[in-house]
Amino acid sequence: MVIRPEDPEDYVAPAAQRVRAGTLLLANTDLLEPTFRRSVIYIVEHNEGGTLGVVLNRPSETAVYNVLPQWAKLAAKPKTMFIGGPVKRDAALCLAVLRIGADPDGVAGLRHVAGRLVMVDLDAEPDLIAPLVDGLRIFVGYSGWTIGQLKGEIERDDWIVLSALPSDVLVGKRADLWAQVLRRQPLLLSLLATHPIDVSRN
């Protein structure tokens, strides 16, 4: 259940996390729309213009090598393109996890998002990026909300706002990231991780 603050503009979620770049949106158990069911969305931008994020747990069958071969070596396994959301499926967006201690300042093609996460310009030179990152993920499309739209969905309990770990962005194809994120939360939230993937079994 979402905590209701006194100021409706300062909406927060169960872990008292404000929506901002670097947080996660976790689909609540009642959100059954196929595009976002059990989705984990990493917020890349959140400002007065709206909110932009990418779904972390929707791998495609398209190999990175077949689309952007120059980046295949740096792509985390599985080395496939991930479906970031329903908006602009003809565009690609890349996130990378910096190595501990790496400094992206002044490096052409890198833009800091939050913590150890950076956005990578896919026109940049991979050899310049490689020494700085543990791995990267390339997304086709993204998830977007206009001003106030995401606020309404959170108030409707469609989403849970939680902290992200750098490893969330590079999680493997076989991992159930939705359940993993919930299991590391306090007791009441962690219990949601047992919610069946097939709701007919509930």
Swiss-Prot record:
Disulfide bond residue pairs: none
Protein name as it appears in the record: UPF0301 protein ML0028
Similarity-based family: Belongs to the UPF0301 (AlgH) family.
One term under GO cellular component: cytosol
Domain of life of the native organism: Bacteria
Signal peptide: none
